[in-house]
């Protein structure tokens, strides 16, 4: 006799990974519940991560654009805005996103349960509701999509009113004139751009020898130069010895002997999976030191009926990839296997000011692999559209095979880079000889557009061949 479960599947977390899994499951006829500990759906992506930080970035970049526009060069009309004002714009976007995502669940008859869940046994969850009651829920299968949170070292006092992480920085209500950002990864670099754009002094502490080392070196160097040119002070190969919170700010002691003082500190060095509250020990599931779970190609954990997607499984830790992972896991969960899979070359978008985006191999990787590649470049300052809108800072670089003309990598630095990259990505994904740099020479682009950079870069690269 078949077992009677409350649900076919329970999804823990309503971020991009959880949403992708839940929507994929209900579309296949499964009875699904989604558990969310926060009072709104959307997860960290919507409330503390991607959406608010990008909304902040957009507001700041528009202020910079206004102040640098020669039409408004009368200094009596310089535009200024407080961090609190800009946060209001982010709140508006968050509310729109939340309402939209809540609608997805309601239209698809997917039940949302609020509270903190933990495993009792392999098929049972205890749900601690916000009113203090505890419910017991059973399901045949589970998807863990509980996301991640900023890493908190034990010797840093995050309760201090001037010490923030990348979540709590969104509740910053004073106006700092000087900020220390510890950690020069994607989050640290994005917030360095935002604060510097608001005319705040920034000390960016990098524990490594260059910024964003996973990027093509030219892109990394471009960002370093742009930061230097805008007044961001970058300190490479540094680690903190001690962090002191004061009444009027923060003092950071570095292991190199240096001391820095600023109005506040943003600690942005690493993230950890939100698995510690799930009581995974009750079901024999183990996480690594960062609270992350190991999964196979179908996103199954060591227990085949429990799947995991999103930040909780580590790389690539992107909202876009998490949604796809959830969708693939849903297919595997219902059908026993997944025909869909993540694409090999996942695009990266970094929302600094200006943006950076890339897909495929870097020059350093191709050189190490001894692939005979050539480079085609287009400078934004030579494009009519860039000149019209004043977006002269930036470049598009296409790496392609000298003999087959196959596109191997695309790297873009400049405004709208994260949008521009997808034109090249679409051609890179073509099979049967469709992936060729000659496509950009043989097609007709609207004029004037930023997309035209592909034609300029393709001609530049092909002209290097002999």
Swiss-Prot record:
Keywords from the UniProt entry: Cytoplasm, FAD, Flavoprotein, NAD, NADP, Oxidoreductase
Highest rank taxon of the organism: Bacteria
Gene: sthA
Reaction(s) catalysed by this chain's protein: NAD(+) + NADPH = NADH + NADP(+)
PANTHER family found in the cross-reference section: DISULFIDE OXIDOREDUCTASE, SOLUBLE PYRIDINE NUCLEOTIDE TRANSHYDROGENASE
Top enzyme category: oxidoreductase
Molecular function terms from GO: dihydrolipoyl dehydrogenase (NADH) activity; flavin adenine dinucleotide binding; NAD(P)+ transhydrogenase (Si-specific) activity
One Pfam family named in its UniProt record: Pyr_redox_dim
Function: Conversion of NADPH, generated by peripheral catabolic pathways, to NADH, which can enter the respiratory chain for energy generation.
Similarity comment: Belongs to the class-I pyridine nucleotide-disulfide oxidoreductase family.
Cofactor comment text: Binds 1 FAD per subunit.
Localisation per UniProt entry: Cytoplasm
Record-level GO cellular component terms: cytosol
BP GO terms, sorted: 2-oxoglutarate metabolic process; NADP metabolic process
Sequence positions that bind FAD: 36-45
InterPro entries, alphabetized: Class-I_Pyr_Nuc-Dis_Oxidored, FAD/NAD-bd_sf, FAD/NAD-binding_dom, FAD/NAD-linked_Rdtase_dimer_sf, Pyr_nuc-diS_OxRdtase, Pyr_nucl-diS_OxRdtase_dimer, STH_gammaproteobact
Named cofactor requirement(s): FAD
SUPFAM superfamilies the UniProt entry points to: FAD/NAD(P)-binding domain, FAD/NAD-linked reductases, dimerisation (C-terminal) domain
Phylogenetic classification of the source organism: Bacteria, Pseudomonadati, Pseudomonadota, Gammaproteobacteria, Enterobacterales
E.C. numbers: 1.6.1.1
Annotated source species: Citrobacter koseri (strain ATCC BAA-895 / CDC 4225-83 / SGSC4696)
Disulfide bonds listed in the record: none
UniProt name for this protein: Soluble pyridine nucleotide transhydrogenase
